[in-house]
């Protein structure tokens, strides 16, 4: 519906029989009223056309093809505002076939039927209003032995049961003696005067309720129970507490019905709405076989049983009352199965032992109508996959699997193939994409270079839950992500999934580049703290990367249990020499040796370092001093080494480190230099 502010909205609730009739009934130009479905048939087996007054009737729901009636006549639909014309022979209007998506029908039930959601769902709204046990109400509705029960009619005329209520004593067997009269002659007159059974009794009692009186009486009782002192009996006190909770729920329910202008008797159905045909289709599959929605079969079951009950009530006056009650029970069960199959019981199955999919199954759950097609629609140009860590990625890049990328950018690839005259039409281009020719990957790379993508992880609780990235192709089926951006998404690499979206318009791409790229969202929008900080895996990696030489040369020299060579073998104290650890002139040589697998990531090494006044001015005493024949000597400290000439001048300085330390230092140095260049560039622009 559309409210006064032109906001589209959907409201779910109870409606009156008059409203159901207004939705489903329509008046043809010849003043004929149609809308009631009376036949349980769908299509004629010979003509393959919808049966008249059946579940797919074109008179009720509209034509299957726009402007074509059931006779095959055709009329041009010029203006929908004009009065629609119809075929006088078959009674089908010449309107658009899309009317079959929203035009409803109805089934006029031969007996009232309780809505199973309001009777059997817990808490039961009907039991709450009537303040009666649910088992007693079920016995009244379904007439099941031995839980069979009946109610007094609401009529004010004197009855035997009303007179019986004046006596002080009770006959315990009266409840079981009444069913003996079901097969006696004249039972109908007795039943109509003395007792009321089935959903009709529920409807009478609900219609006789005054909601404001219920609120007043419930509040008075709740207040009275609240003023009573505890009895000391745990069972009695708990019973009083449950009664008070029940009264609160009853008052809230009555207030809700008053606020929404809903009458309690609407929970008992007299007219059963029939869904539009397009929402419960019959589809022809390969081999000429028909595949139908389960709801059609459930509707057919309701119509069959309802027509049988109608015949029993109208044509056969001598029908036993017990047979009528059994048929009413069958109608009630058929409607229950249609609305919610298997609620608090065994579900109904077809001939292949498959459970029928009822109306509740269609709308509820993750794959239901609301969550799949209304609330969480599937979006074009989008995909979903598991995320894994991409340690070699830049902060603003993400790895997109080839299988996902070729589907998301398929239209762009087709355009590229046609522009480069590699395909004559769309069909040829799609065949090349299916065959995954080498030129496809080249064009895909060109397309992805200038096209950002959006990654989203549900739930999106703040604006950093969706960020833009520059995609690159990767092997496998998982999306590769830089670990620093995980905190903004509140994601980790334990099986989390992310959705991929392709911004199509120029405005969306501009917004993604200028506002949503991950390297532009380094601070939390809420408190301003850095949000791209190392966590979890990165902290462990940094620890392993820098854990090689924490204890210095002293530990390696005087504690042989802590010294191991590259083959993970313990070095004997007598054979250990610092000269056995490799020397490198610069960091590039050390990294090259690591890439050639001559040293490990945590293997200690000596790296030539620039002269540092902090090292020279240090008062630390050397661990050892080694003299050479030319007069030079080596001063060995815990973490560094100084080579001096005969004049005690410093020639070289070496620091004891690992390849992991070198990697970390280079990254930090490059980051500082980049930040410095950015600051200097900003100052230049401001000048």
From Swiss-Prot:
Cofactor note: Binds 1 Mg(2+) ion per subunit.
EC number: 2.7.7.6
Chloroplast in keyword set: yes
Residues holding Mg(2+): 492, 494, 496
Ligand binding (Zn(2+)): 69, 71, 87, 90
Keywords: Chloroplast, DNA-directed RNA polymerase, Magnesium, Metal-binding, Nucleotidyltransferase, Plastid, Transcription, Transferase, Zinc
InterPro entries the UniProt entry points to: DNA-dir_RpoC_beta_prime, RNA_pol_asu, RNA_pol_N, RNA_pol_Rpb1_1, RNA_pol_Rpb1_3_sf, RNA_pol_Rpb1_clamp_domain, RNApol_RpoC1
Location of this chain's protein in the cell: Plastid, Chloroplast
Cofactor: Mg(2+); Zn(2+)
SMART domains in alphabetical order: RPOLA_N
Chain's role: DNA-dependent RNA polymerase catalyzes the transcription of DNA into RNA using the four ribonucleoside triphosphates as substrates.
Family stated for the protein in its record: Belongs to the RNA polymerase beta' chain family. RpoC1 subfamily.
Oligomer status and interactors: In plastids the minimal PEP RNA polymerase catalytic core is composed of four subunits: alpha, beta, beta', and beta''. When a (nuclear-encoded) sigma factor is associated with the core the holoenzyme is formed, which can initiate transcription.
Name of the protein this chain belongs to: DNA-directed RNA polymerase subunit beta'
Species in which this protein is naturally found: Silene latifolia
């Amino acid at each position: 519906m559309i409210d006064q502010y032109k906001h589209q909205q959907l409201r779910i609730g109870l409606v009156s029989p008059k409203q159901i009739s207004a939705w489903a009934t329509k008046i043809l130009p010849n003043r004929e009223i149609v809308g009631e479905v009376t036949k349980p048939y769908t299509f004629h087996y010979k003509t393959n056309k919808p049966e008249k007054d059946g579940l797919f009737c074109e008179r009720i729901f509209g034509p299957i093809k726009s402007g074509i009636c059931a006779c095959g006549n055709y009329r041009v639909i010029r203006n929908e505002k004009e009065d629609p014309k119809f075929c006088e022979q078959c009674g089908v209007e010449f309107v658009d076939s899309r009317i079959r998506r929203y035009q409803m029908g109805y089934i006029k039930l031969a007996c009232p039927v309780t809505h199973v959601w309001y009777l059997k769902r817990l808490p039961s709204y009907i039991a709450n209003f009537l303040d009666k046990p649910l088992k007693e109400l079920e016995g009244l509705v379904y007439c099941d032995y031995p839980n069979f029960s009946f109610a007094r009619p609401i009529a004010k005329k004197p009855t035997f049961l009303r007179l019986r209520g004046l006596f002080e004593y009770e006959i315990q067997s009266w409840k079981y003696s009444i069913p003996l009269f079901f097969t006696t002659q004249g039972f109908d007159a007795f039943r109509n005067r003395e007792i009321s059974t089935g959903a009709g009794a529920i409807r009478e009692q609900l219609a006789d309720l005054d909601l404001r009186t219920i609120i007043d009486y419930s509040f008075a009782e709740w207040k009275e129970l609240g003023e009573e002192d505890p009895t000391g009996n745990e069972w009695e006190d708990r019973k009083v507490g449950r009664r008070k909770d029940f009264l609160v729920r009853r008052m809230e329910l009555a207030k809700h019905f008053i606020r929404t202008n809903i009458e309690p008797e609407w929970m008992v159905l007299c007219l059963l709405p029939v869904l539009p045909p397009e929402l419960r289709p019959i589809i022809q599959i390969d081999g000429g076989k028909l595949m139908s929605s389960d709801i059609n079969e459930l509707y057919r079951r309701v119509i069959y049983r309802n027509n049988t009950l109608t015949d029993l009530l109208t044509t056969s006056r001598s029908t036993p009352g017990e047979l009528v009650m059994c048929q009413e029970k069958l109608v009630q069960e058929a409607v229950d199965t249609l609305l919610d199959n298997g609620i608090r019981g065994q579900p109904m199955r077809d001939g292949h032992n498959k459970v029928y999919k009822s109306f509740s199954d269609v709308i509820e759950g993750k794959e239901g109508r609301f969550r799949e097609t209304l609330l969480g629609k599937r979006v074009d140009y989008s995909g979903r996959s598991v995320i894994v860590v991409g340690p070699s990625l830049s902060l603003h890049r993400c790895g997109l699997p080839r299988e996902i990328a070729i589907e998301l950018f398929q239209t762009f690839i087709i355009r590229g193939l046609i522009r480069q005259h590699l395909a004559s039409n769309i069909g040829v281009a799609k065949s090349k994409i299916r065959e995954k020719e080498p030129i496809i990957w080249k064009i895909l790379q060109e397309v992805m270079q200038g096209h950002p993508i959006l990654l989203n992880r549900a739930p999106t609780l703040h604006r950093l839950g969706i960020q833009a990235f520059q995609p690159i192709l990767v092997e496998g089926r998982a999306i590769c992500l830089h670990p620093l951006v995980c905190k903004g998404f509140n994601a980790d690499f334990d099986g989390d999934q992310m959705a991929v979206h392709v911004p199509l318009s120029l405005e969306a791409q501009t917004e993604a580049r200028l506002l949503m790229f991950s390297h532009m969202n380094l601070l939390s929008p809420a408190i301003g703290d850095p949000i791209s900080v190392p966590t979890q895996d990165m902290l462990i990696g940094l620890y392993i990367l820098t854990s090689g030489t924490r204890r210095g040369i002293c530990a390696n020299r005087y504690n042989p249990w802590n010294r191991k060579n590259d083959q993970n073998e313990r070095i004997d104290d007598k054979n250990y020499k610092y000269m056995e650890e490799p020397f490198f002139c610069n960091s590039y040589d050390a990294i090259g040796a690591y890439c050639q697998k001559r040293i490990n990531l945590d293997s200690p090494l000596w790296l030539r370092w620039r002269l540092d006044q902090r090292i020279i001015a240090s008062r630390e005493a050397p661990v050892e001093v080694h003299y050479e024949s030319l007069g030079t000597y080596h001063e060995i400290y815990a973490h560094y080494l100084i080579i001096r000439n005969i004049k005690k001048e410093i020639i070289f300085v070496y620091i004891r480190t690992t390849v992991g330390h070198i990697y970390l230092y280079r990254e930090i140095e490059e980051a500082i230099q980049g930040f410095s260049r950015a600051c200097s560039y900003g100052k230049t622009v401001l000048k």
